[in-house]
Amino acid sequence: MPAYSTVRVGKKYSPSFKVYVTQDGKIVSPFHDIPLYMSGNREIVSVVNEIPRFENGKFEINKEEAFNPIKQDIKKGWPRFVKNVFPMKGYLWNYGALPQTWENPHEVDRHTGARGDNDPLDVIEIGRKRKEVGEVYQAKVLGSIALVDEGECDWKVVVIDVNDEKAKEINDIEDVRKVYEGLLEQTIFWFKNYKVPDGKPKNNFALDGKYMDKKFTVGIIKSAYENWCGMINSKSDTNICKENSTLMDKVDSPAIIQEDLSDEEVPECVHQFEFIK
C-alpha cells in the first residue's frame, strides 16, 4: 500500500479544524484518490479513519471542499459532539469510510427500500489499536448492518485491520461474536440510541436488524464502488467536490502547512453519561 500521511490545520474541536490526507507530500482526496481495492482480493479494502475509538467529536470527510479534508461536523454553528450513551464512551470503534464508494441518494437500495445518504460507505473497525483522524489502512471485510437514519439507507461495514493481532481469528461476522462477545449487540444499541440525548427519535434498522455476512457485504461494497464510478464521471451531483490528484481532470494539489495548535476546549457533555430507557 502507498504511504499516506496527514496535514493538520487549525485547532481540533473548532470550526477551522481540517485534516488533509497526503501521499508523497502531495495533498490527495480521501474520497476519490485512495484506491478502494489495492489488490484483486475484494475482501480486503482501504479504509480512511475519521473518528478514533472513544472520541466524541463527529469528524467526517467533507464532500464539498476541494480535496475533501476531514472536518468536524457543524450543527447550528457549533462543532458537533456525540453524547456518551451509558456505559459507552464516545464511539465504540474506529469509525471511518471506504474511499471510492458512494451511497446514491437518487436510487432506492434494493435490500432496504431506502435511498442512499449521499456519503461514502461507513466503516466500524473493531481492532485493538486506536487509529488517528485521517489514518489510512487495509482491512478485512467481516459483515455489515443496514441502519436507516432519518429515512436514508446508511450501511455500516464491519472490518478489522489486516495487521491487527486478532485478524487471523476473525474472518466473518460470526467470528466477531466468538472473539468479542457482546460487541455486536452493543453496536446495535449505540446506533439505535446515540441521537436520543439530542432530542431525536431512535434510529431503525432494515433487514430486521440482522448482521449480514462477508459475502453479502462484499456485494454491497461493489455496488457502492460502481455508484462512485458513475458519480465521478458524471457532471451532475455538483454538491460533491471531485477535485483530485490521481484521476481525470487533474488539478494542482494545494500547498498546506501543518499547524501544531492546542486543542479547543470541549463541552461538558463529553465528560458525562446519558442514560437511555
From Swiss-Prot:
> Is Plastid tagged as a keyword?
no
Enzyme class (EC, first level): hydrolase
Kindly list the residue ranges recorded as spanning the membrane.
none
- Taxonomy, superkingdom: Eukaryota
What this chain does, per the record? Involved in osmoadaptation.
Q: Which CDD domains does the record match to this protein?
A: pyrophosphatase
Q: Could you say which residues bind Mg(2+) 1 here?
A: D117, D122, D154
User: What EC identifiers does the entry list?
Assistant: 3.6.1.1
Query: What positions does the entry give for Mg(2+) 2 binding?
Result: D122
Gene name for this UniProt entry: IPP1
The cysteines joined by S-S bonds are none
One GO BP annotation is: phosphate-containing compound metabolic process
Q: What is one term from the GO cellular component aspect held by the record?
A: cytoplasm
UniProt-recorded name of the protein: Inorganic pyrophosphatase
Task: Fetch the InterPro entries from UniProt.
Answer: Pyrophosphatase, Pyrophosphatase_sf
Keywords, ordered alphabetically: Cytoplasm, Hydrolase, Magnesium, Metal-binding, Stress response
Its annotated compartments are: Cytoplasm
Organism the protein comes from: Encephalitozoon cuniculi (strain GB-M1)
Which protein family is it in?
Answer: Belongs to the PPase family.
Q: Which reaction does it catalyse?
A: diphosphate + H2O = 2 phosphate + H(+)
State its cofactor.
Mg(2+)
